[in-house]
Amino acid sequence: TAFHRVIEKAINEQVDFVIISGDIFDLEDRSIRAQVRFKNELTRLINANIGVFICFGNHDFVSNRKSDFNFHEQVVIFGPQPEQKKFHTQAGVDVYLYGFSYDTRHVVDRKIEQYEKGEEEGFHIGILHGQLESNKEHDTYAPFTIQELVDKEMDYWALGHIHKRQVLHMDPPIIYPGNIQGRHKNEQG
């Protein structure tokens, strides 16, 4: 599968961590088989000492039932409010990741207003499953403007929600990575 290939690449490249910025599943009511495959791939990352940070999005939001099984304790899942998590790389660099997970299908609040970059030395990454406010092609979820992201002074923004690869800004990088596997013929993957 496409996800298996991404995990294989991460292991081969010996990356420090992987960020999943939402919509790993297409629906909240995901199959047990899909969840088991997902968990198995995450276990491969953990076994390779690669960190995993997940923000669930509008397609795979985490309701009160959380999940049909527990994730490995080393898999970091962001809660429903923006929060900071720390990761220490093997090279000795402190990385601070900021994000939140959807706890309902429709998050229309301006969650970006709740992101607060810490004062710690290190690399700061914002993770946001949301939509550029000016984009009227999709329903608006967790809207933001490019200027709002720039003003947060993160070193990088890992975005989710839009399934098409887009570079919104270069300094700092504000990136929609797109999806790794198209859901239909109109999505490239």
Task: Show which residues each predicted segment covers.
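His/Asp/Glu-rich metal-coordinating catalytic cores
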Residues: F17, R30-G189
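N-terminal active-site segment of His-dependent metallophosphoesterases
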Residues: T1-Q35
